[in-house]
Amino acid sequence: MFSQKLLANGKLLSKLAIVSGVVGTATAITTSTTLLSDDFVQPTSYPWEHRFPWQSYDHAAIRRGHQVYTQVCSTCHSLNLISYRHLANVAYTPEELKAMAADTTVMDGPDSEGDMFERKGQVTDFHPKPYPNSNAARFANNGALPPDLSLVIKARGAHEDYVFSLLTGYCEPPAGVRVVGGQYFNPYFPGTKIAMAPPLADGMVEYDDGTDNSMSQMAKDVSTFLCWASEPEHDDRKKLGMKVLLGVSIIALPLFYWKRLKWSVIKTRKISFKD
């Protein structure tokens, strides 16, 4: 009945055809735009130990990664959500953190007279920002705004694989690819042209524990540190999950026996009818 009315109404059919054409064209444009923008290499999936359900973060790697961030990455990138006290008993002792924070200068205030003043850093302070505002950051980086690294691992689909591949993936552009001044070729960056110069090189950071300071090792350590920074509760969450699973498994056996005991009478009963 509906199909007959639809065929009889020519105007309705023409409108439906126009709408279908517009939707199809929009879908094709969106698809082609997505394909054109996806001109970068997908990062390799690496076997990070902390990804396994029973594994925690490598806390020695977190300490080394924080050292790489402090000496290399902090010159351009902020870490707004991590204070020094967050690293206590994770990568440093409280005494080490107090000394580390005291080496920084923090703008505080206002005082009783309404003026801002400088003071030594405390463990409750967050890591200092490299630039006072976003305009200063853009001016110092050829118009590019260095992202905050607190949640950069969560903000990328490949997570720590992306950060590691990006840091170690700088190379010469292939034939036919033009890179203007102030940009560098990196096949793992969307668009393949990035304003950040290669940040790491072999031997750039001297580790306190004597670990090999190759570029790949530093990239691995700072990726682990940033992964922890994006999810500091990772280890506690896994510990709680293991406790819950252990408790449930212990309770499950007596509950199963109790269920069999209570339902055995109902499941095995027989009803007979007398004539």
Swiss-Prot record:
Cofactor entry: heme c
EC number: 7.1.1.8
Assembly and oligomerization: Component of the ubiquinol-cytochrome c oxidoreductase (cytochrome b-c1 complex, complex III, CIII), a multisubunit enzyme composed of 3 respiratory subunits cytochrome b, cytochrome c1 and Rieske protein, 2 core protein subunits, and additional low-molecular weight protein subunits. The complex exists as an obligatory dimer and forms supercomplexes (SCs) in the inner mitochondrial membrane with cytochrome c oxidase (complex IV, CIV).
Gene giving rise to this polypeptide: cyc1
Protein's GO biological process: mitochondrial electron transport, ubiquinol to cytochrome c
Enzyme class (EC, first level): translocase
Interval spanned by the transit peptide: 1-28
Signal peptide (from-to): none
GO molecular-function terms, A-Z: heme binding; metal ion binding; ubiquinol-cytochrome-c reductase activity
Cofactor comment text: Binds 1 heme c group covalently per subunit.
Physiological role: Component of the ubiquinol-cytochrome c oxidoreductase, a multisubunit transmembrane complex that is part of the mitochondrial electron transport chain which drives oxidative phosphorylation.
Occurrences of domain Cytochrome c (ranges): 60-212
Membrane topology annotation: Single-pass membrane protein
Protein name: Cytochrome c1, heme protein, mitochondrial
Domain of life assignment: Eukaryota
Subcellular location: Mitochondrion inner membrane
Record's GO cellular component terms: mitochondrial inner membrane; respiratory chain complex III
InterPro entries reported for this sequence: Cyt_c-like_dom, Cyt_c-like_dom_sf, Cyt_c1, Cyt_c1_TM_anchor_C
